[in-house]
Curated annotation (Swiss-Prot):
Pathway: Glycan metabolism; exopolysaccharide biosynthesis. It catalyses: L-tyrosyl-[protein] + ATP = O-phospho-L-tyrosyl-[protein] + ADP + H(+). Keywords: ATP-binding, Cell inner membrane, Cell membrane, Exopolysaccharide synthesis, Kinase, Membrane, Nucleotide-binding, Phosphoprotein, Transferase, Transmembrane, Transmembrane helix, Tyrosine-protein kinase. It is a multi-pass membrane protein. GO terms for molecular function: ATP binding; protein tyrosine kinase activity. It comes from Klebsiella pneumoniae. This is Putative tyrosine-protein kinase in cps region. Pfam families: AAA_31 (PF13614), GNVR (PF13807), WZC_N (PF23607), Wzz (PF02706). Signal peptide: none annotated.
């Protein structure tokens, strides 16, 4: 009759409840603490050794654009005259502005002190050992030396405050402060040395485009508030004085560009007027001559009151049309015909032209003499008005040109903040702590998900297997203690029998509990033969069987322990007995039965060793001598315990199992999987052997059991010491 009853399928590894997860994290706390501490330490080192980054900023105001003399009234036609910041921001970040800054500050020359790699610069800053600096006013490297991807780089060594040496391409070039060096494609001038003799500096010459790109990367321009017309320029860098000079240079170059552009607009308008004035004056003189000639021929005919009124209106319309013509010539240089400003001007011109057409129709109804004198008078008046208007505009433009200030002004010059903006030490350390915690917890969770070993008796019971005992890891062996703390198992074989060496050990206490359970479990067995096997090597079946034999013998029962592992049995070492004559020797017929029985020190405890390793263990076990031996032992002893090889490795246990009345399977905690135990049970059943139950060996006390399942086995010890 089998003791195995099929129950529900075991939980999968993915079925992790919150309590078990908390327990696992507590069990792996040392790994979590170690990784988190390591990540925090790295963050601390970075926070203190990383180069501080400072920020310099300046404020610039972009005012509403001043209309020049010709466009003085144009703002009335615009729906919104607020400054547009996006074009100004793009202009500040353009190569035109930044390129001028690169030239002004010689930013193509990158000079940096030489430090020990990685930590050298930070250590020098923390210890106050600064390398000093050098002032370089001119540097040029021929394009034949290096390229944009690999800019030329050379080393400058300070000899004293007035002399230095350049090392480049295996050659040395000696130089003095204030002297220009021109040699081998290198042009260099050092103005000042503020460094100790022996100090080294790296000098790199980058292309202008690369220098501009570096400026664009570290420069930010943004509005300070919506529709304020205030721009804030910010620049990041590790040299407080240098970044201040860079921001000041960018601001000044932007201001100068704005002023020059305004002056250029006035210059173009003035050039246009200078061309128009002579032609307008000539037309005016011609119109006056024609009017005088007409009056002489017609005896000084004067205009009627109606004609004078029409003339005044026509002259007024013509003046407005002429002014629009000037405006159009200026606007055409700034906007396309599709721009709203240009369209508004054209609509106003059409309105004036329509009005002039109506006035011309009124003139057509007058007498011919009045029409002619009206036409000539209109030409004179319109020409005179245009000429005077142009003269006024010319004077205004001359004044505007000489006093152009643009629509930009610098409100606050550049200032570098005293405290660095990067790295934020507290944030860096907290980030390191968080990242270390996330990584360590993730590794633990991945390890848990990948682990498929048995952790609780419930997993075996879900397979329908009775669990007779859960044996904890012995703490008597220091290796076991270390392995327990590291959540590992100890693969080394025991050298002594724990039941005699330390009978108070928790593992032996668990085996005593197993002894009690077996007393009742074997009452219905067909004989008193007990076979103990394992699913796989290192399950601990030898440890369990040998110590179980010892604790049963201590009750006064007559016990014989047989090492039936003919391949790797080692129990003779536990009992300190020579392995000359053993089970294999008896089964092969080389020795008699009485020669293989060893009487141990404990009364009533006999032992049969493995014997010599045979070439055919399975065949020997199928010999009739094994049946005869077991029948004799069954009659001669109260209990016979056999230690057999693991069933998944060899078939020896299946052969022996047909002779015994009780079979127990040993499973290793977190080592054997439920699937391995299930396969082992089926393999025994296929051979006609029924498994009475299972022993869970090597159990480690874990927080997982406390928080996840609520079981803690052998958490207490019992002693008579006070």
């Amino acid at each position: 009759m089998t003791s195995i009853s099929k129950k529900k399928q075991p939980e999968t590894v993915d079925d992790l409840d919150f309590g078990r997860m908390v327990g696992e994290l507590i069990d792996h706390r040392k790994i979590i603490i170690a990784l988190t501490s390591f990540a925090t330490l790295i963050a601390l080192l970075y926070a203190f050794f990383a180069t501080p980054i400072y920020k310099a900023d300046a404020l610039i105001q972009v005012e509403q654009k001043q209309a020049n003399a010709i466009l003085s009234n144009l703002s009335q036609m615009l729906p919104d005259s607020q400054p547009q910041s996006a074009p100004e921001i793009a202009l500040i970040q353009s190569r035109m502005i930044l390129g001028k800054t690169v030239d002004d500050l010689n930013l193509q020359a990158v000079v940096s002190p030489k430090y020990f790699p990685i930590f050298g610069r930070g250590w020098a800053r923390l210890s106050g050992e600064h390398q000093g600096n050098i002032q370089l006013s001119r540097l040029y490297v021929s394009s034949s030396i290096g390229d944009e991807e690999n800019p030329p780089e050379f080393t400058l060594k300070v000899k004293d405050s007035n002399r230095y040496v350049i090392e480049f391409g295996g050659e040395e070039i000696n130089g003095k402060v204030g002297e220009l060096i021109e040699k081998d494609g290198i042009t260099l001038k050092i103005d000042e040395i503020n460094a100790k003799p022996g100090a080294e500096f790296t000098i790199k010459y980058v292309s202008k485009l690369k220098a501009i790109a570096d400026l664009q990367e570290n420069l930010s321009v943004a509005d300070q508030g919506k529709d304020t017309g205030i721009l804030i320029l910010s620049y990041l860098g590790d040299d407080p004085l240098k970044i201040k000079n860079i921001v000041d240079s960018i601001s000044e170059n932007y201001l100068a560009q704005n002023i020059s552009r305004q002056a250029a607009q006035d210059e173009k308008s003035l050039e246009f007027l200078n061309k128009q004035l002579p032609m307008v004056r000539s037309d005016l003189d011609s119109a006056e001559d024609k009017l005088n000639d007409f009056r002489k021929r017609n005896d000084s005919v004067d205009l009627s009151l109606e004609a004078k009124s029409v003339l005044d209106q026509i002259v007024n319309v013509d003046n407005q049309l002429n002014e629009l013509t000037f405006r159009e010539s200026e606007i055409s240089q700034l906007y396309t015909k599709e721009h709203p400003t240009y369209k508004a001007l054209m609509e106003k011109r059409k309105t004036l032209q329509d009005e002039r057409g109506k006035l011309n129709k009124r003139v057509a109804t007058m007498p011919e003499t009045q029409q002619e004198i009206l036409r000539l008078s209109r030409d004179v008046e319109s020409g005179r008005a245009v000429y005077m208007q142009l003269l006024n505009r010319q004077q205004e433009l001359n004044i505007a040109k000489s006093s152009a200030i643009g629509n930009v002004r610098i409100i606050d010059s550049a200032v570098t903040q005293h405290k660095p903006v990067k790295p934020k030490k507290i944030i860096v350390v907290l980030a390191g702590l968080f990242i270390g915690l996330v990584i360590s917890v993730s590794l633990v969770l991945v390890r848990i998900l990948l682990r498929k070993g048995i952790e609780t008796p419930e997993q075996l019971e879900e397979l329908g297997i009775n669990v007779y005992a859960s044996i904890p890891v012995s703490e008597s062996n220091p290796k076991n203690v270390i392995a327990k703390r590291l959540n590992k198992r100890d693969d080394s074989r025991p050298k002594v029998l724990l039941a005699t060496e330390n009978p108070a050990d928790l593992a032996i206490e668990a085996i005593r509990g197993l002894r009690t359970s077996l007393h009742f479990a074997m009452l219905e067995a067909r004989n008193n033969l007990l076979m103990i096997s394992g699913a796989s090597p290192n399950a601990g079946k030898t440890f369990v069987s040998s110590n179980l034999s010892s604790v049963i013998s201590q009750t006064g029962k007559k016990v014989i322990f047989i090492d039936a592992d003919l391949r790797k049995g080692y129990t003779h070492k536990l009992f300190n007995i020579k392995n000359t004559n053993g089970l294999s020797d008896y089964l092969s017929g080389r020795v008699a039965l009485d020669k293989i029985i060893n009487n141990l020190q404990t009364e009533g405890f006999d032992y049969i060793s493995r014997g010599s390793v045979p070439p055919n263990p399975a065949e020997l076990l199928m010999h009739n001598r094994l049946a005869e031996l077991l029948e004799w032992a069954n009659k001669s002893y109260d209990i016979v315990i056999l230690d057999t090889p693991p069933i998944l490795a060899v078939a020896d246990a299946a052969i022996i199992g047909n002779y015994v009345g009780t079979t127990l399977l040993v499973a290793r905690f977190e080592e054997n999987t439920p699937k391995e135990i299930d396969i082992s049970v089926k393999r025994f059943q296929n051979s006609g052997v029924n498994i009475k139950g299972c022993i869970l060996n090597g159990v480690v006390k874990k927080a997982t059991n406390k928080y996840g399942y609520g079981y803690n086995y052998y958490d207490y010890s019992y002693s008579d010491k006070k």
